[in-house]
A protein has these predicted regions:
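Cofactor-pocket helix-loop regions in the catalytic cores of large enzyme subunits
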Residues: 1-167, 171-174, 186-363, 402, ...
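A residue-level signal for beta-strand positions that form part of recognition/binding surfaces
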Residues: 120, 380, 397-401, 431, ...
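C-terminal segments
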Residues: 145, 479-480
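Non-catalytic terminal/interface segments that mediate subunit docking, oligomerization
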Residues: 377-424
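Short, solvent-exposed secondary-structure boundary/capping segments
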Residues: 467-479
Length: 480
């Protein structure tokens, strides 16, 4: 477990982890804080923030050069570019990683031995890995580690991203990425045009922009209008001051949401949407399980499900979107996304969801991927060196490292949970956790309101002293 306080972020996954632990599974947690997951662990690596990549590279060094614990058969038969990886790891000893990570070399060695020994080892990670300067490289290094030990393509192995919401996987499957169409077909590919033009007609084939590029475009004026649906970037995106400047610089802003969020307050037009209890459709979760959801309550007067709003907007713009139901839309998805082709609403209801790929009506679904081969044929080892600048250096003006994360009673920006009195009662305001030694040095006391200032901005929060984090670090939940 790396980069995830699963007890607060994914409580159902945490329940499975605790059950596996009771059955004898070994648990390793990499987290700067001593969270409930860390307390449960056989090994807790209280890493120095920002240094996940150095740790993963050191683990592979131990497995490869000291323990000879790599899966040579898997490497030879299923992967490529292994020699480049091997050369890049030669100097990544535990002694090299120790001053970077703050970990003892023997703890790194013990972790490497336990993971490689298996016989089945699985890695779960979340935003503590991805939302860092080295996030992409660390994900690549984790994929290297999995392939190095052959821990993929069979039950109880693999590399599992714990998604931030219940349909992140489904959104990506349906093309909510800048470079792909539904089914992960490149937008500018011949296959993409062949597959989708027959349903949609001609369409633009250039790749879209990444979220950071969109925000930059709003500020520099190259993007003049935006349509934001189910998103609250005024609270969820980094550097709120720059986000607000970009949104205010637009000529026209549409926001489609279920509540009046800080982002919606800046909109020229608000399209009131229905909540998840008021619509039908599917969610696809982190294990690629497509699950049917049913309408529990009718939408409130003046609101509509997202799919209906989108159809109405398309038709108003002169397009054609004459769908009558989510079922009809799903049937179109089945035509153009082969991994969904064997599913229908009846099967999803009867079988309590199916994991894609499910290419035919008689296919049982696929509980785990890459059993015989990878999508590209062979798995590609990549070189992921640790950069000189990790983006989190402290100095005299900013002597603390800020950690962010969730609490169990709030969900993302709190748009929904702050409207539940029972949930909001537990965490009604922002708080800052600080080690007692640091609080004493600054002559701060529990329950005082303090101003936390970074290079990007500041926030007022109520102080809590906590011994579950390291001196020199502070923790702030990102719901506020």
């Amino acid at each position: 477990m790396i980069g995830s306080n699963t007890s607060a972020q994914h409580p159902l996954a945490y329940a499975r982890i605790t059950a596996a632990k009771k059955r004898g599974a070994k648990l390793i947690t990499v987290d700067p804080r001593r969270t409930p997951v860390a307390t449960l662990s056989d090994i807790h690596l209280a890493i120095r923030p920002g240094n996940n990549l150095a740790l993963v590279n050191a683990l592979m060094h131990v497995i490869l050069f000291e323990e000879k614990g790599q899966d040579d058969a898997f490497i030879n038969e299923r992967t490529e570019h292994f020699d480049a990886l091997r050369a890049s790891l030669e100097g990544c000893t535990p002694e090299w990683a120790a001053p970077l990570t703050g970990l003892q070399p023997e703890a790194i060695r013990e972790t490497a031995r336990l993971y490689a020994k298996g016989p089945n080892s699985i890695i779960l990670y979340c935003m503590g890995v991805t939302q860092q300067v080295t996030g992409t490289r660390t994900c690549g290094a984790l994929a290297n580690l999995v392939m190095l030990c052959g821990m993929i393509g069979r039950p109880s192995t693999g590399l599992i991203p714990l998604r931030g919401q219940n349909n992140v996987q489904g959104s990506c499957d349906m093309g909510a990425l800048p470079e792909t169409l539904p089914g992960y077909v490149k937008a500018d590919s011949e296959l993409g045009h062949q597959r989708f033009a027959r349903l949609w007609g001609p369409f633009a084939d250039e790749q879209g922009k990444k979220l950071t590029e969109i925000m930059d475009g709003m500020r520099d004026g190259s993007i003049r209008a935006a349509y934001i649906m189910g998103e609250n970037p005024m609270q969820s995106d980094p550097d709120a001051a720059k986000v607000e400047a970009g949104l205010r610089n637009l000529d026209f802003l549409i926001v489609q949401d279920i509540f009046m969020t800080p982002t919606a307050r800046l909109a020229d037009v608000i399209l009131p949407a229905a909540s998840y209890l008021e619509k039908q459709g599917t969610f696809t979760n982190t294990e690629r399980r497509v699950q049917l959801i049913n309408e529990v309550l009718p939408p409130l007067p003046g609101t509509r499900p997202d799919w209906r709003i989108l159809c109405d907007v398309i038709n108003a713009l002169g397009g054609r979107a004459d769908y009558d139901s989510p079922r009809e839309i799903f049937n179109e998805i089945r035509q153009v996304v082969p991994s969904y082709a064997g599913m229908d609403y009846t099967r999803l209801a009867e079988e309590q969801g199916l994991c894609w790929p499910c290419p035919t009506p008689d296919h049982p679904g696929t509980p785990y991927l890459h059993a015989a081969s990878f999508t590209r044929g062979r798995g590609l080892f990549t070189v992921n060196d640790v950069p000189d600048d990790l983006g989190c250096a402290t100095d005299e003006t900013y002597p603390f490292t800020l950690l962010t994360g969730r609490v169990s009673h709030h969900y993302h920006t709190g748009t929904m949970t702050r409207r539940s009195w029972a949930l909001d009662r537990e965490y009604p305001e922002a708080f800052l956790d600080m080690h007692p030694d640091d609080a004493a040095a600054l002559r701060l006391k529990d329950n005082w309101k303090v101003r936390v200032t970074s290079r990007q901005g500041s926030i007022v929060a109520r102080l809590r002293t906590a011994t579950d984090l390291q001196p020199g670090t502070v923790f702030l939940p990102f719901h506020f």
